[in-house]
Amino acid sequence: MTDKFPEDVKFLYIAYTPAKADITACGIPIPLDFDKEFRDKTVVIVAIPGAFTPTCTANHIPPFVEKFTALKSAGVDAVIVLSANDPFVQSAFGKALGVTDEAFIFASDPGAEFSKSAGLSLDLPPAFGTRTARYAIIVSNGVVKYVEKDSEGVAGSGVDAVLAAL
């Protein structure tokens, strides 16, 4: 795939700081302007239906944390873990997984708007609402190099598939 990544994509996140390292510490959400921050970089966006959910917590995101050095060695400048959860939940999720690197970002896709626009959202029962699907995207210099959505498991959106696609 060689499509241009959409312009004007903005997520919300809370930047990790040592002063706010405690999982209960609340930072202030700020915009993550994809165009501005990642224009000439290689970024992996890995989306999850929800922070602290079984597959996301046990099988999907921990391998990205464990293989972050390998991702950087393969040319990745940043990893963005994306969900429709609010930025406070995303921040706590990153802290719970022990992530402290500023290039490993836990961001919110409010209302799953970006994911919906890309055809990568899920409509779950009313108690859960619209969520981001489980997917991975590799964007390099503003061009989408890889997109894979999983309906079950993490075969296409997991770290091994992402590393193989780099």
UniProtKB/Swiss-Prot annotation:
Its EC number is 1.11.1.-. It is an enzyme of class 1 (oxidoreductase). InterPro entries: PRX5-like, Redoxin, Thioredoxin-like_sf, Thioredoxin_domain. It catalyses: a hydroperoxide + [protein]-dithiol = [protein]-disulfide + an alcohol + H2O. GO terms for cellular component: mitochondrion; peroxisome. GO terms for molecular function: thioredoxin peroxidase activity. Homodimer; disulfide-linked, upon oxidation. Belongs to the peroxiredoxin family. Prx5 subfamily. This is Putative peroxisomal peroxiredoxin. The lineage of its organism: Eukaryota, Fungi, Dikarya, Ascomycota, Saccharomycotina.
